[in-house]
Regions:
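Catalytic core of bacterial c-di-GMP phosphodiesterases, primarily the EAL and HD-GYP domains
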Residues: 58, 108, 136-209, 282
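Alpha-helical scaffold within the catalytic cores of cyclic-nucleotide enzymes
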Residues: 1-13, 42-44, 144-154
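EAL-family c-di-GMP phosphodiesterase catalytic domain
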Residues: 7, 16, 94, 113-120, ...
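Regulatory helix in c-di-GMP signaling enzymes, encompassing the GGDEF I-site helix
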Residues: 2, 24, 39-50, 58, ...
């Protein structure tokens, strides 16, 4: 009935009637199938089958769909290269703010989305996991930074907002790529302090020299994927990075999970000792925001702070920051 109601809705825009459609994927939750990650994956696969079948479909998950989905997800090397070189790339901006002053936003985390050759939207992490050649990571990083400096850096500088872009471990390990990045930064109007780079925390151990080179140039470093493995703090020292970005899984249900609350409290203590700030998210519920605020987390992002929006829309709005 929900699907039918959406399909029957008449959306009028500028005097024209536009057709609205919806698709749905359904899976069974019972004693034998109750792991959240698995259930969500099944629902996603069923939903994909609905969208692939046409407008206004409802599909119930069946195991054979997973195999079919995996076959579709397996991209050829040529397709991967074509997506990096030619297909549309969208940068989505996620506002970051203190949970104690959620209205004050001047840092925006950037997530990436690409269009496949079949027109399907693929997020950065899913796309990177499909890479069958390390050179693809280098090429993807180059594409991201080239587009940012060519299309957005000037507007970002005029707004005075800080932008955080992802940099892969493979990209960080390439001296040529790091040098090219710094050259583009030097030739752009963007002050280096406004460019934040999101780097997996594990990279700090093997690529400390490259990270330090970026920091000395004025860039801010955000170490991501900080979660349940606290061994990283045996190697981290003060002035190695500026921020710690917590795993999303760690704060998703922190308001009702004492173990997660304790882990975040420990991470917060390490961050303070090292002179780094913590970032947690995505946060949807005000109750989660309040819990993180009580722990002392410095910054959060998610729907509770601001809806994600395309970077070009953000920099072309009337919003600006004093930074």
């Amino acid at each position: 009935r929900i699907i039918s109601a959406v399909n029957d809705y008449h959306f009028i825009w500028e005097g024209r009637v536009h057709r609205v459609g919806a698709s749905a994927g359904i899976t069974l939750i019972d004693d034998n199938n109750h792991q959240a990650a698995e259930v969500m994956s099944q629902a996603d696969i069923a939903c994909y089958a609905s969208k692939n079948g046409g407008r206004g479909r409802v599909t119930v998950y069946e195991p054979q769909q997973a195999a079919a989905h995996s076959e579709r997800a397996a991209m050829s090397l040529d397709e991967q290269w074509r997506m990096i070189k030619e297909n549309q790339l969208m940068m989505m901006a996620h506002g970051v703010a203190s949970p104690r002053i959620p209205e004050a936003r001047n840092l925006w985390l950037i997530s990436l989305k690409l269009w496949s050759c079949e027109g399907e939207i693929i997020d950065e992490q899913t796309f990177r996991r499909s890479f069958s050649d390390p050179a693809l990571s280098h090429a993807f990083d180059r594409r991201v930074f080239h587009e940012f400096f060519q299309q957005a850096a000037k507007a970002v500088a005029s707004k005075g907002i800080s932008i955080a872009l992802p940099l892969s471990v493979a990209g960080l390990s390439s001296a040529t790529l790091v040098n090219d990045l710094l050259e583009q930064l030097e030739n752009s109007p963007l002050p280096p302090r406004l460019l934040h780079l999101i780097i997996p925390a594990e990279a700090i151990l093997d690529h400390a020299e490259s990270v330090q080179k970026l920091r000395l140039a004025g860039c801010r470093i955000i170490l991501s994927q900080v979660g349940r493995d606290l061994q990283i703090f045996n190697s981290l020292k003060a002035n190695m990075a500026d921020y710690l970005l917590l795993d999303g899984e760690l704060c998703a249900n922190v308001q009702g999970n004492l173990m997660d609350e304790m882990l975040i409290t420990i991470i917060q203590g390490h961050a303070q000792r090292l002179g780094m700030k913590t970032i947690a998210g995505p946060v949807v519920l005000p109750l989660v925001m309040d819990t993180l605020s009580g722990i002392g987390v410095d910054l959060i992002y998610g729907d509770v702070i601001a809806d994600a929006q395309p970077l070009d829309l953000l920099v072309n709005s009337s919003y600006f920051a004093i930074n």
